[in-house]
Amino acid sequence: MKVQITNSRTEEILKVQANNENDEVSKATPGEVEESLRLIGDLKFFLATAPVNWQENQIIRRYYLNSGQGFVSCVFWNNLYYITGTDIVKCCLYRMQKFGREVVQKKKFEEGIFSDLRNLKCGIDATLEQPKSEFLSFLFRNMCLKTQKKQKVFFWFSVAHDKLFADALERDLKRESLNQPSTTKPVNEPALSFSYDSSSDKPLYDQLLQHLDSRRPSSTTKSDNSPPKLESENFKDNELVTVTNQPLLGVGLMDDDAPESPSQINDFIPQKLIIEPNTLELNGLTEETPHDLPKNTAKGRDEEDFPLDYFPVSVEYPTEENAFDPFPPQAFTPAAPSMPISYDNVNERDSMPVNSLLNRYPYQLSVAPTFPVPPSSSRQHFMTNRDFYSSNNNKEKLVSPSDPTSYMKYDEPVMDFDESRPNENCTNAKSHNSGQQTKQHQLYSNNFQQSYPNGMVPGYYPKMPYNPMGGDPLLDQAFYGADDFFFPPEGCDNNMLYPQTATSWNVLPPQAMQPAPTYVGRPYTPNYRSTPGSAMFPYMQSSNSMQWNTAVSPYSSRAPSTTAKNYPPSTFYSQNINQYPRRRTVGMKSSQGNVPTGNKQSVGKSAKISKPLHIKTSAYQKQYKINLETKARPSAGDEDSAHPDKNKEISMPTPDSNTLVVQSEEGGAHSLEVDTNRRSDKNLPDAT
């Protein structure tokens, strides 16, 4: 592009190099033209065979066009194959570029194709999807759509891609013939040499096919030593093969070209014989054994053809399961390791390598009966009865010296009442049931070693020994599915198997660490307390007890307090009872330090040990002892001399005075003096 500056103004001159570009494009090599035609044929092949030979769970299949257009996808949804309008436009753009025409106005070109797609009606050739539906979301995630608006998604076999391309090309050629701007322009072969004849009886698509066959570089192959890379599908009509570039209407009418067309056909006949040697072998021309035929047929297959068939793993690798040799079968002995049973739902995290922890316990297996694993934990839940019984009948019975089935003879019942009846149906049914029971027992108690290719075994504990003096044997088994067994009412006592005392807990449950709830789930008894008092007597009577709380219903809004200080001692609830604070009384000895103060109580020191209830002195005895000590106190003179700062004073009677001393309830001395002689205050102090 050249730029010319004139009068300080920039003028851009377009299409100056148009003639030079056309000269360069016209000199395109025949190999490039052949490659473009081959890519068009590959796209047509994908559009015709995309819905063939899909995998079981395959949903989408793609075909890569180029870096500009991306992929074209065939989507399998609701048992139908779909293609979006965006992918249809991509196919038309790709074919137009490979044909040699560059798209100038892309938006207008797409509008013309979408206008043709309106002829495909909903329900017949397409389905109408609502905005942001599940199908549109899937297509948008896989780059099949540009938006999730309400639009049509077309059925795969209802779209005529060749007709859409021919109609788009015809519109542009008609605009060019009328000197109107078109959406595409020719830039390369074979579009440069193609001319549309509107007066001809042949439609545009037939003229286009005829021109594409004429533009194949077949005439230049004679000078080359290598054979041409031509596909058989492009030479369906041998009459259209020409050597020289002639006008469109003169194909097949020239007499000079007649002897050359058979030579072209003769050139391809030896190639067919070389590519397809199977016909010679099948006709008996070669004397080879039948087992050599598959090898020869595999060699004669074209390596460039990509297969569309997908083989399962069982076909490609038939001996994959036997790649690892199993462990040698051996009987159960005390020294032999016991591998746990392999379950269907075993996880890799639960697996562990084979080590010394798998050694069996030193006891005989015949002493400990084997309990079968429930079917719900070792087999899939959706197995039908027919599949279950058929799988048992197909498996062979394995005999082990220590297997319980070796000495348990299910075929010989203790009492058989059906032997006197000569009925064949009964005997057959009996033998079938016995064989079925034996095989079912063998299915779950296979004591032989099993193979583990990765060297890992399920990390379950080995079987526990059976102890008749212990708990229930079902609870001692280390396998999942114990909830499938129900305890019979006459077999054992559930209360014995599940004791509620704290001594039977192996691990303290986390509920014991939490505070007690406000609601206590116990039955309401009017004559008993709802809060347990001790382990031996959980519900204490409240009729003869004055220091305990009265009975409270557990269903009431107010629950019994768990922090009260007047509860009796118990193993479940340990409170600090009868612990009084130390208060030092002024003017008293150290032996009189502990004095009760009404109902006020507080927690004592942590190191203080309280005496048992039957050794402690009652509150009434303590008060009585204090009163006796108060009456036997020393004289006031000694107290005043010992404690001069004491405010309490007691007057003593003398022969010259008549004084009455009265003791108050508070322990203080209050005296009332009656002096008949009216002595002066200086001699004796008045009583306060």
UniProtKB/Swiss-Prot annotation:
Gene Ontology MF terms in the entry: DNA binding; DNA-binding transcription factor activity
- Using the UniProt annotation, give all residue ranges assigned to the region (Disordered): 177-199, 211-239, 285-305, 587-610, 630-688
Q: Name one GO cellular component term.
A: Ste12p-Dig1p-Dig2p complex
* Keywords of this entry: Activator, DNA-binding, Nucleus, Pheromone response, Phosphoprotein, Transcription, Transcription regulation
Q: Recite the other comments.
A: Present with 1920 molecules/cell in log phase SD medium.
Q: What does this protein do?
A: Binds to the DNA sequence mediating pheromone induction (called the pheromone response element = PRE) which is found in the upstream control region of several a-, alpha- and haploid-specific genes. Involved in mating of haploids and in pseudohyphae formation in diploids.
Q: Which family does it belong to?
A: Belongs to the STE12 transcription factor family.
Q: What is the UniProt domain comment for this protein?
A: The DNA-binding domain seems to be involved in the suppression of pseudohyphae formation under nitrogen-rich conditions and in haploids. This region is also involved in the regulation of budding pattern of haploids.
Protein name listed in UniProt: Protein STE12
Q: Which species does this protein come from?
A: Saccharomyces cerevisiae (strain ATCC 204508 / S288c)
Gene that produces this protein: STE12
